[in-house]
Amino acid sequence: MNDIAHNLAQVRDKISGAAARCGRAPEEVTLLAVSKTKPASAIEEAIAAGQRAFGENYVQEGVEKINHFQQAGVSGLQWHFIGPLQSNKSRLVAEHFDWCHTVDRLKIATRLNEQRPAHLPPLKVLIQINISDEQSKSGITLEALDALAAEIAELPHLELRGLMAIPAPESEYVRQFAVAQQMAVAFARLKTRYPTVDTLSLGMSDDMEAAIAAGSTMVRIGTAIFGARDYSK
């Protein structure tokens, strides 16, 4: 078993353990492998180990990888855009990705809707919440959620699937859980209003257990699978 396959198995075990401890089934939590800055060869190793959902933060890099695997005839992969989205890059996301986790304003949602090719299924979108109210991060407040969700739900080429957040780093489990629970409450409310909503993208390597205990349905894990990132390229 190579390193990536071994790492994936360990991460899946951690997810299963975290789910079991709070009475949830492991299948309720999707593992999103964050492959930003990693070469296609690393993704190929993850695919060989059964991984199908991948997250990319940089539009151009992600599109190159998507094209690489399409040209190689590899099907059944899911590509999630999880980085900050600028208006001038929205067309590439709309044309190539299956999911966008970082919708935080109507302007971006409208552009994605207009630019999504008609022959593709609707782009699955998550509304990004700035749950820790950090100026350095994208996302809306929970107070602004209802209005934006209602507007996105009207766009025919987008499918509102839920919420995403990147909480501020917290070392204590109790604090992590308290923040995650705020997201879980908002997610539960959203689910009652929109039948397509089923995804709470919350939790990374350091806070995954608390996120799963609070109700996360998707965790985003990178370094624990692929190793340290090289940002020099």
Question: At which residue positions do the language-model features occur?
Answer:
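Expand to "…catalyze enediolate/carbanion chemistry for C-C bond making/breaking, isomerization
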Residues: 210-213, 221, 225-233
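Conserved alpha/beta-domain cores
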Residues: 1-206, 214
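Conserved N-terminal glycine/acidic-rich loop preference
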Residues: 218
